[in-house]
């Protein structure tokens, strides 16, 4: 079934951003554009290149009125450890959402039940909290921030 125009369910998750832990809720996404960028796990090989690519384009997303949220099933503590130990991930200033309960992954239909990890899913959510663009890639198929930004501009 299509996810287009599906409203994001209420949520409250922990996040790591700019050296701090914080709570992010559905209220935080309403009134502006959002990108939810799901990836399998911290400390993996493809994920750092994708997340760094997003960071390199972050100012353009922000100028377009859009917040980026990366999401994995790792805890916010693991996000901090990865951020502190990886040169690429250490550059990231957008919120890194923790979904250890799998609530967000289930809502966006990207949970790989057998592994307890997320698929590589990219979702653009409008200011009303509805999904208007989505893409889910298999395995090690990486994503491109320029293409995601183009889709945001077209939305």
Name the predicted role of every residue range.
Residues 1-155:
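Chalcogenol-based redox active-site neighborhoods
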């Amino acid at each position: 079934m299509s996810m287009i125009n599906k409203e994001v369910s209420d949520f409250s998750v922990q996040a790591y951003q700019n050296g701090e832990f914080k709570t992010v809720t559905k209220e935080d996404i309403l009134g502006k554009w959002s990108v939810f960028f799901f990836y399998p796990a911290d400390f993996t090989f493809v994920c750092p290149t994708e997340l760094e690519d997003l960071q390199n384009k972050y100012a353009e997303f922000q100028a377009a009125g859009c917040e980026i949220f990366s999401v994995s099933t790792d805890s916010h503590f693991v996000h901090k450890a990865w951020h502190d130990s990886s040169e690429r991930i250490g550059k990231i200033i957008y919120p890194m959402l923790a979904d250890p309960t799998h609530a967000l992954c289930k809502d966006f239909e990207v949970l790989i039940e057998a592994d307890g990890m997320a698929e590589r899913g990219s979702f653009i959510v409008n200011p009303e909290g509805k999904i208007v663009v989505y893409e889910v890639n298999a395995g090690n198929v990486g994503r491109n921030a320029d293409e995601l930004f183009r889709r945001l501009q077209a939305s």
